[in-house]
From Swiss-Prot:
Top-level EC class: transferase
Descriptive protein name: Phosphatidylglycerol--prolipoprotein diacylglyceryl transferase
PANTHER family according to UniProt: PHOSPHATIDYLGLYCEROL--PROLIPOPROTEIN DIACYLGLYCERYL TRANSFERASE, PROLIPOPROTEIN DIACYLGLYCERYL TRANSFERASE
The species this protein was found in: Geobacillus kaustophilus (strain HTA426)
EC number(s) stated in the UniProt entry for this protein: 2.5.1.145
Job of this protein: Catalyzes the transfer of the diacylglyceryl group from phosphatidylglycerol to the sulfhydryl group of the N-terminal cysteine of a prolipoprotein, the first step in the formation of mature lipoproteins.
Alphabetically ordered keywords of this record: Cell membrane, Membrane, Transferase, Transmembrane, Transmembrane helix
Matches recorded under Pfam families: LGT
Key word Cell membrane present: yes
Compartments, as annotated in UniProt: Cell membrane
NCBIfam families noted in UniProt: lgt
Family: Belongs to the Lgt family.
Ranges in coiled-coil conformation: none
GO terms of molecular function: phosphatidylglycerol-prolipoprotein diacylglyceryl transferase activity
Length: 270
């Protein structure tokens, strides 16, 4: 039966000489849904409705460039010999941590230029970011990437997955852990957790720090299953190192901001 399994078509649409891939469509959908949610919350929090539209116009291109640069840097042994492939982001190869660095840096500059609180913007954006990540992982699914080690078909059937997911995990003659799905579900739970924490009315900035902690815990765990991790040295996985660093820094910043009185404003404060 395996010999007849065909992967899902990676192409969403052909427009003459232009090919649009599912990878880009799915990531774009995540961005648009996240933008809609952030804009609604921004208006509720007393910000102009165009605030996040303006921010996204800067943050998304910069995040994509940073995500690609991060990935290419760790895979330079390959891309140094295939320079023409560096711009081909539709083939995959966007590192979330690189994109996050670019987006946060852009957000900080944007907030300063607009005279806004960075932490207020970050808190509003946090649920949108993690939901966008949950959606975006399905782009990896369509590209048959970001998977874990080999498993049996029976293992996947025991997870009660539909055949279209099981069949898509059949790559190079073997079935593989659907780690894209694990991370997508982890992030989806994180999205609802952040919505609940938003009602708790934490100190300003702590919702974003909660996002960093939650995402990093899940990423550390799931990254250990993957077979395509970006490596620092030997068996040291870059994403796991970054995840631990983010957890430690987020907790430390949470404690220091409260101890120093830097986090007096609440999420719901104007």
């Amino acid at each position: 039966m395996e010999s007849t399994i065909q992967p899902l078509d990676r192409v969403f649409l052909h427009l003459g000489p232009i090919t649009i891939y599912w990878y880009g469509v799915i990531i774009g959908t995540g961005v648009l849904i996240g933008l809609w949610l952030a804009t609604r919350e921004a208006v509720r929090r007393g910000l102009p409705k165009e605030t996040f539209v303006d921010l996204v116009l800067f943050a998304v291109p910069i995040a994509i460039v940073c995500a690609r640069a991060y990935y290419v840097l760790f895979e330079w042994h390959y891309y140094s010999k295939h320079l023409s492939e560096i711009p081909k982001v539709w083939q995959g190869g966007l590192a979330i941590h690189g994109g996050l660095i670019g987006a946060v840096a852009t957000g900080a500059v944007f907030a300063r230029a607009r005279g806004l609180s960075f932490w207020k913007l970050a808190d509003i954006a946090a649920p949108s970011i993690i939901l966008g990540q949950a959606i975006g992982r399905w782009g990896n699914f369509m590209n048959q990437e970001a998977h874990g080690g080999p498993v049996s078909r029976q293992f996947l059937e025991n997870l009660h997955l539909p055949d279209w997911i099981i069949n898509q995990m059949y790559i190079d003659g073997r079935y593989w852990h659907p780690t894209f799905l694990y991370e997508s579900l982890w992030n989806l739970v994180g999205f609802f957790l952040l919505l609940w924490l938003r009602r708790v009315n934490l100190r300003r900035g702590e919702l974003f720090l909660s996002y960093l902690i939650w995402y990093s815990v899940g990423r550390f765990w799931i990254e250990g299953m993957r077979t395509d991790s970006l490596m620092l040295a030997g068996s040291l996985r870059a994403a796991q190192v970054v995840s631990v660093t983010l957890i430690v820094l987020s907790i430390a910043l949470w404690i220091v901001r409260r101890a120093k009185g830097w986090a007096k404003a609440r999420y719901q404060d104007e």
